Amino acid sequence: MYSVCDVVRDAVAQSHLCACPNDKLPQCKGVTKAPPECSVFHVAKLQDTKFKWKYTLDPLKAQKLNQINKDIEKDAITLKLLYGIELSPEDLEWWKMQRCLINKKTGAKGGQFANKYLERQDLELLGYSPTPIIGGDFMFTALPDKVLRTIPIAWDRFLNPAMMIFFLIILLCVILGIFYVLVRNTLRRKQKIKQHQMEIKRFIKEKEQDPYIHTSFESWPADPNKEWKELIPVYEAQGYCMADYRKKLGMPPGPNC
């Protein structure tokens, strides 16, 4: 029973013939037709193209996606006849296929299409190009291999120049959204503070209408001698003369004196 990785490795083994027939390529001498295993690369390339068309506003989007699906179905039938198994096109994508490939240097499984497994440049010569990371193929000559190994091919989908503008727009919208929320909250806080200040001023203005304002009986602000003033009538009711205390507290003259 074949697995997806078996199919992928078969395709890699035949990849040097995938561009045939081509008189300019020495390996194509006498080859009249590309091996059916190359359908794996066809599907991967179509999946990449399909992914890009899904997120376009082009009026031909529906028509293009329909044609791509038909082409994928043709290659899927070819692979089914060859291996006798149903292969999901979603399993034949560049970033998934990398799990099945073998490191040319160490023999380890997994990694990305760049200087390590089935070379990205080799695929381009054959007419199949995995979506390059941001910066395009220039990055593969400008950066050392150790750096490239840290970039999983899964990110190829999202860090390529064609898709980067899409994510930059999303990032810009997020930044603008955060800025809008911060400005809105700041304005709301200022509005609340201003409203509270207006309420305090209105409250003070109402209090200033007290008929006893600026007298010893004013109700605002609170009188610190209030308790003593309340005790004086109590003592006077018992017959004491509280004239001196009334004078000190600013109270009018009372009885018993």
UniProtKB/Swiss-Prot annotation:
Location in the cell: Host membrane; Virion
Q: How does it sit in the membrane?
A: Multi-pass membrane protein
Induction remark: Expressed in the late phase of the viral replicative cycle.
Q: What is its main location?
A: host cell
Q: Which residues cross the membrane?
A: 123-143, 163-183
Asked if the Swiss-Prot or TrEMBL record annotates the protein with the keyword Nucleus, the reply is: no
GO CC terms, sorted: host cell membrane; membrane; virion component
Asked if the record carries the keyword Transmembrane, the reply is yes
Keyword list, A-Z: Host membrane, Late protein, Membrane, Transmembrane, Transmembrane helix, Virion
> According to the lineage, what is the superkingdom?
Viruses
Protein family (similarity comment) = Belongs to the asfivirus C257R family.
Name assigned to this protein: Transmembrane protein C257L
What is the organism of origin for this protein? African swine fever virus (isolate Tick/South Africa/Pretoriuskop Pr4/1996)
